[in-house]
Amino acid sequence: MANIHQENEEMEQPLQNGQEDRPVGGGEGHQPAANNNNHNHNHNHNHNHNHNHHRRGQARRLAPNFRWAIPNRQMNDGLGGDGDDMEMFMEEMREIRRKLRELQLRNCLRILMGELSNHHDHHDEFCLMP
């Protein structure tokens, strides 16, 4: 009987380590190997507890973001509307991007034209290059 019990214990051990260590961080639910029988007995209890704890942890992690976002929105509404500000901002960004793109294109053309005009004497060589 003892051997069979030990084999089961060894088979379950990796699962317990994988599932329970992550949410709790090696503290609760990760008992020393000396308490093998207790550990096995408490496995379901610990696992359920940790599962709920993990979910609660995720919710708590998300909450500050919501709390942070809501007051800002209220402030912006008071100042003249959240949506308008965002739309203005997006339009400005789009215009800036458009200007940047135009500048880049102009620079590229200028460089190309500059190269062509610089190499005007070697125009045939320039064209022959693959």
Curated annotation (Swiss-Prot):
Region (Interaction with 14-3-3 epsilon), start-end ranges: 87-130
Subunit structure and binding partners: Self-associates. Binds to the DEATH domain of p75NTR/NGFR. Interacts with 14-3-3 epsilon (YWHAE). Interacts with DIABLO/SMAC.
Pfam families named among the record's database cross-references: BEX (PF04538)
Tissue expression profile of the protein: In cochlea, it is expressed in pillar cells from postnatal day 2 to adulthood.
Disulfide bridge positions per record: none
Regulation: induction: In neurons degenerating after kainate-induced seizures, likely in a zinc-dependent manner.
UniProt KW keywords: Apoptosis, Cytoplasm, Metal-binding, Nucleus, Ubl conjugation, Zinc
The encoding gene: Bex3
The protein's name: Protein BEX3
Motif range (Nuclear export signal): 96-106
GO annotation (BP), single: signal transduction
Protein species of origin: Rattus norvegicus (Rat)
